[in-house]
Amino acid sequence: HNTKRGNMRFLLLIVSFFVFAQLTSAQTVNPDYDSTLAKKLGADDYGMKSYVFVILKTGSNTTTDKAFIDSCFSGHMANIVRLVNEGKLIVAGPLGKNDNTYRGIFIFNVNTIEEARKLVETDPAVNSKLLEADLYNWYGSAALPEYLETALKIGKYKIN
């Protein structure tokens, strides 16, 4: 009986050693690692960070008042530009037609859903219930905000 227990402990020790060895060998140091850039972007050891991902969907307001709708969506676009300029919004764009009434996405460069919710509430299309927002914590590359500099240079027409 004690021999079985001793053999199990030995087996567990051997398995633990191999699991630990595998985990530590899987973490190869990146020779291109730039600690200054990683710190500037808020990256963790894997080059990742937390964001808030938002799915915008058709809201409960079914008005057909074109002037009202145009005004709200003009404000929606102006709000997007403002949030991008403040460094809070790093991805925004419409989705193609779909059966889920999903209209677009946002990715906010903030850590909490509460922070993102306050930013979403500044959107006239959301406030008027033309759009509704579902917010999710998302873990992605800390380099994501870096694409904005290039994105602003490749569009022939300015979004305003």
Regions found by a protein language model. Name each.
Residues 1-29:
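Bacterial Sec-dependent N-terminal signal peptides
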Residues 27-160:
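Conserved, structured core segments of small domains
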